[in-house]
């Protein structure tokens, strides 16, 4: 069954231009991934009828995998399948595939070509009786990955989970939680980006108000998920259950091959994965779980200690008229720091002869006091060994300037005390915190909101750490020695 449907899907992909599919956020799941997702369900085989939903069904690969899994497990009841799909090019293929499934299984099906989000209610106070036709026992999905404007109909329909311009994938996910019967299960393949940060905060609050995570699968290699699609977005499979009763542990599995042949499983305490602030951590081994345990035992943050990280002030391509390549004697210019000024030994090296290293402006929003800072690169490549790459900026090295500025591809932390400055640097430049951030955030971007939320020691301890580092090489090795002593 699955292979026949897969072949029709491959034929469609070969004919449909990728740009057309990208307009829908449309990427098709591989057969092995679909099979793995379907086997994650704990189907109740005693139910006389099962209601199954696949929103954004595409050609029906995931629906077929779920139905086939039920048949393989010996389910003898009736399967009622509902599929949403709005792409008129793919709907005829979907209907053909569902009819094929109908001939081989005890199955009824409906294909809805309406908008999955806007055609049904979404609110905690909606009468359950009014929602009965939108309730399902099991939901499987590969939701569309597409950023939409904050005033798009879908965003306006679901303000409870939106912050700024949302992505359709988590609106589909939130609506699917709304669609689940109590104790129902959902298995979705989604990007990893939802696990942290302010952008997804409302969604995470909604998720954990209504459901709990049961299992997670991580793809070590990003190009193995959508085998014919050249997708490099970091993705995961997640299984949730509509219940507020938390399991003791979450099963986290991982694989680096397209056929899941090197599958590993790891049981992690629920409270290690889901933090009190609803950030989600996804360790894949005991070492990473140990990192989380050590850091999450601390209670302060950069924010509580009033040394928050901020993003650099200048978007250089928007401010070209105030950028200068060199100092000009007749006007007042100030240093403008870029990520390229952060050296590998933790020093700030400026100027280096690049264009736009000076700024001439009196606009307060583009200038900051010439104080002591830690500069942190906002972007690193996937191949680089460290995600947190920082340098110590000392105002005493540039005494003639009252102000400086920072390009928005770096983050900065201002510290009045030198001991505090070096102590915070020791934390961020340590292996422990680099590992912690990598577990928290799978992307290559260093987000100030997430760094500000990372647990750190109290100010007195950080100052003592800084006193130990002051005057020493600013290497990770030295930082590790100090951090190991205090944390």
Spell out what each predicted region is:
Residues 22-23, 27-36, 57-64, 78, ...:
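Signature of N6-adenine DNA methyltransferases within the class I
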Residues 74, 230, 404-405:
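Short, flexible turn/loop "capping" segments at secondary-structure junctions
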Residues 1-75, 82-100, 120, 143, ...:
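Class I S-adenosyl-L-methionine
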Residues 293-487:
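Polybasic, glycine- and aromatic-enriched phosphate-binding surface used to engage nucleic acids
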Residues 106-116:
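Conserved SAM-binding strand-loop segment of SAM-dependent methyltransferases
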């Amino acid at each position: 069954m699955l292979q026949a449907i897969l072949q029709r899907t491959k034929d469609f992909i070969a004919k449909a231009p990728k740009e057309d599919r990208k307009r829908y956020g449309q990427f098709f799941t591989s057969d092995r991934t679909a099979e793995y997702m379907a086997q994650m369900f704990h189907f109740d085989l005693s139910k006389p009828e099962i209601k199954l939903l696949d929103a954004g069904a595409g050609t029906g690969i995931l629906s077929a995998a779920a139905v086939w899994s039920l048949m393989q497990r010996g389910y003898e009841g009736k399967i009622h399948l509902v599929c949403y799909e709005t792409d008129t090019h793919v709907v005829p293929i979907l209907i053909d595939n569902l009819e094929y499934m109908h001939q081989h299984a005890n199955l009824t099906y409906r294909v809805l070509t309406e908008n999955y989000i806007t055609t049904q209610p979404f609110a905690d106070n909606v009468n359950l009786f009014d929602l009965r036709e939108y309730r399902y026992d099991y939901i499987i999905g590969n939701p569309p990955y597409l950023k939409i404007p904050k005033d798009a109909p879908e965003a306006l329909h679901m303000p409870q989970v939106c912050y700024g311009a949302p992505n359709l994938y988590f609106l589909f996910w939130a609506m699917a939680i709304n669609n689940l019967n109590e104790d129902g299960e959902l298995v979705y393949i989604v990007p990893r980006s939802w696990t942290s940060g302010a952008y997804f905060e409302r969604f995470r609050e909604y998720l954990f108000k209504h459901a709990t995570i049961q299992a997670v699968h991580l793809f070590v290699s990003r190009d193995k998920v959508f085998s014919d699609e050249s997708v490099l977005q970091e993705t995961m499979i997640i299984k949730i259950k509509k219940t507020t009763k938390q399991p003791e542990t979450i099963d986290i599995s991982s694989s680096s091959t397209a056929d899941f042949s090197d599958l590993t499983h790891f049981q992690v305490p629920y409270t290690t994965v889901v933090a009190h602030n609803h950030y989600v951590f996804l360790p894949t081994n005991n070492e990473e779980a140990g990192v989380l345990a050590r850091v999450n035992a601390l209670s302060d943050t950069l924010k509580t200690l009033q040394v928050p990280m901020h993003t650099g002030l200048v978007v250089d391509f928007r401010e070209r008229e105030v950028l200068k390549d060199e100092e000009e004697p007749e006007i007042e210019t100030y240093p403008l720091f870029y990520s390229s000024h952060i050296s590998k030994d933790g020093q700030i090296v400026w100027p280096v002869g690049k264009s736009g290293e000076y700024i001439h402006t009196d606009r307060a929003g583009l200038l900051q006091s010439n104080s002591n800072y830690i500069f942190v690169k906002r972007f690193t490549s996937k191949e680089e060994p460290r995600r947190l790459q920082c340098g110590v900026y000392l105002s005493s090295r540039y005494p003639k300037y009252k102000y400086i500025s920072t390009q928005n591809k770096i983050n900065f932390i201002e510290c009045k005390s030198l001991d505090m400055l070096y102590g915070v640097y020791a934390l961020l430049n340590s292996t422990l915190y680099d590992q912690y951030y990598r577990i928290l955030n799978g992307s290559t971007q260093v987000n100030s909101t997430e760094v500000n939320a990372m647990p750190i020691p109290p100010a007195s301890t950080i100052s003592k750490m800084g006193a130990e580092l002051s005057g020493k090489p600013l290497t990770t090795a030295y930082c590790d020695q100090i951090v190991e002593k205090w944390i």
